[in-house]
């Protein structure tokens, strides 16, 4: 089974940690688009396949969705996961890798072409200014938005970066085997989830507030940092 993970990112400081995390989850193929920054891949990545491209993105909201569709048309993988640099795939302890999860999912659900994976939104652990490692973030709240692991050959178009529209008779399921038709699905994250480091530090939130273009669908405000953090609890 060939599974890739696709990333469009503006954030060089996240990339090494993001790569290491997903290699640990079983990913061996990466499709990475670096928006206006250089990155030197070290020798530790010589055993994984990284398709890497430097790009300068236009100031257009649709750019990300159009890029995702091009990736689906160009690359022949069984599945591709489309996530961002502040998002990290997580699995419960019963699964050794993403491959293991999909194989066991197939034993329960035979008719699917993608899996919608809910967000867990993590706050900054009350350490406002310091950016910590991924594993140190433990407080979160459940969010109904999803990101998608999908068979690229079945994708018709992306109208939203969270969920593609598939060809006729193709289906995306959540972890419980329920069909997903919108980018928001009642939260379920017992076996698989996206660890979304939404308010990782105050400094990084300031950058999110200032962003415009493909990565910004709506205006953010500084006070939202504290609003989101206050929703995060130990679960």
Specify the residue positions occupied by each region the protein language model found.
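Catalytic-site signature of metal-activated, phosphate-bearing donor transferases
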Residues: 61-69, 91-235
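Active-site-proximal specificity loops/subdomain of glycosyltransferases
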Residues: 38-83, 90-93
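A structural signal for isolated positions on well-ordered beta-strands in alpha/beta enzyme cores
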Residues: 4-6, 30-31, 49
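N-proximal low-complexity "stem/linker" segments adjacent to membrane-targeting elements
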Residues: 1-23
């Amino acid at each position: 089974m060939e599974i890739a993970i696709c990333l469009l990112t503006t954030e060089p400081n996240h990339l090494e940690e993001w790569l290491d995390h997903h290699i640990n989850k079983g990913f061996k193929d990466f499709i990475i688009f670096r928006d206006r920054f250089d990155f030197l891949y070290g020798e530790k990545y010589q055993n994984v396949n990284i398709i890497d491209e430097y790009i300068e993105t236009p100031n257009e909201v649709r750019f990300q969705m159009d890029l995702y569709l091009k990736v689906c048309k160009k690359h022949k993988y069984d599945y591709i996961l489309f996530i961002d640099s502040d998002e990290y795939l997580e699995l419960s302890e019963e699964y050794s890798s993403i491959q293991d999860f999909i194989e066991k999912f197939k034993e329960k659900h035979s008719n699917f072409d993608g899996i919608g994976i809910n967000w867990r939104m993590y706050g900054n652990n009350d350490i406002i200014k310091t950016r910590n490692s991924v594993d140190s973030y433990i407080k979160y709240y459940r969010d109904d938005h999803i990101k998608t692991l999908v068979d690229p050959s079945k994708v018709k178009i992306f109208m939203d970066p969270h969920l593609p529209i598939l060809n006729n008779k193709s289906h995306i399921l959540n972890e419980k085997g329920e069909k997903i038709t919108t980018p928001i699905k009642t939260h379920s994250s017992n076996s698989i989830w996206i660890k979304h480091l939404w308010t990782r530090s105050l400094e990084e939130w300031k950058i999110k507030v200032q962003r415009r273009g493909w990565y910004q669908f709506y205006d953010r405000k500084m006070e939202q940092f504290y609003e989101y953090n206050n929703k995060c609890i130990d679960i």
